[in-house]
Every structure is written in C-alpha cells, then in structure tokens.
Amino acid sequence: LLSLQEEKQYFMNDNSKYGVFIIEFLRADDCADGEILSQILELSNIDVIYKWANNKIHLAELLQEFKKSKFRYLHISCHANETSLEINGDEITNSEFESISKDVLKNRRIFLSACKAANRDLAARLVSKNNAYSLLGVPINLRFDKSALFWPCFYHLINEIDASKMRREDIVETVKKCVNLFNIPVNYYAKSNYPNKLRRFKIRVG
C-alpha cells in the first residue's frame, strides 16, 4: 500500500475536487437509491451530480461528464454480479466497463451500490489497470432498505471527517462503523506500491 507520505503526495499532484458524481441504471420498477442518495447529499450541503444512464453508449458519455466535473468520487447504483453490470436489460462485462472507463478513473475513488460488484476482477481492472485510487462496495446481494441507509451514513461521516482529502485510514474506520451499524460486509480495494497489484480489505462485523 502507499505510505501516508506517498498518499499525500499522490493527492497533491491531483486537481480533483470534493464531490460525489452518481450514475444510476436500474430496472424501471426499482427504487432509485442513487437518486435518494443525491437528495440526502444535497440536504447535507455535499456537492453532488446525479445522472441516469439509459444504455452502454449513454453510460460511456456520462463517464466523460464525470471526468470533466473533476469530482473525486464516482458512485454507481445498478444491478450486478461478479462478471458484469446490468443496464436496461443488457449487460456490461467487467472487461467492457474497463474499456469505457479507461481514461476516466485516474486518481478517483469508486463506490459501488451494486450487488457482488466489489470483487477482485473488477477492482483489478479499474484500480490496477485504469489507475483508480480505490474501489469499495458489498460482495453480497444487498436489500434496498439497507443500501438506502448505508450510503448516506457513509458519506455523512466522511464529510464530517474531512471534505478536502479522504485518506485510506478515514475510509477504513468509517466503513467499520457503518458495517457494524447495518451488519453489511464490505470489500475495499486500494492501490498498492507494486505495479498491477492492489490490496483488499475485507471489512466485516466485529
């Protein structure tokens, strides 16, 4: 893992700004937890942009909008499994998502409100290959009610800690609090010192 000094230098060379860019693509009859999250973040005076993606091409366009926004955090709300994300009855394989986000994720953090998407394969593609700073999400099928509560709590606590830079230690400690509160397992993948390597934190109750 990067040392604290290396992590500080890493961010000093970055021109991103504090904010959460939410991209959601769920089924028509699903509760839009990403939209609900955006409304709560607005109430908390946290900079947020919310977008709904209709298909693969639209998703690729929205990822470019995220890049232009310079927001540091990308939050994705969708259905998923270990090998792909679901969008409007179609699927985006982990490999396809790696391809359309290739020039987008450098020095950014990714948060996935997507069942089983926080796995080593997708993390390796987005963190190790596409240079995202980290990826965080749940490794299980998560009920909507828990998702709708977990993410606002997480972002609220992070915002209380530091709105300028979010360190690895801040994430781990904050996630531990949320995991214990909601009884939800979380996988957190972070950039490593070693080329094409990443570190996984399995954060569980207790």
Q: Which functions belong to the PLM regions below?
A:
Residues 38, 63-64, 94-102, 123-127, ...:
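Short amphipathic alpha-helical segments and helix-helix/interface helices
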Residues 41-50, 106, 129-138:
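Structural alpha-beta junctions
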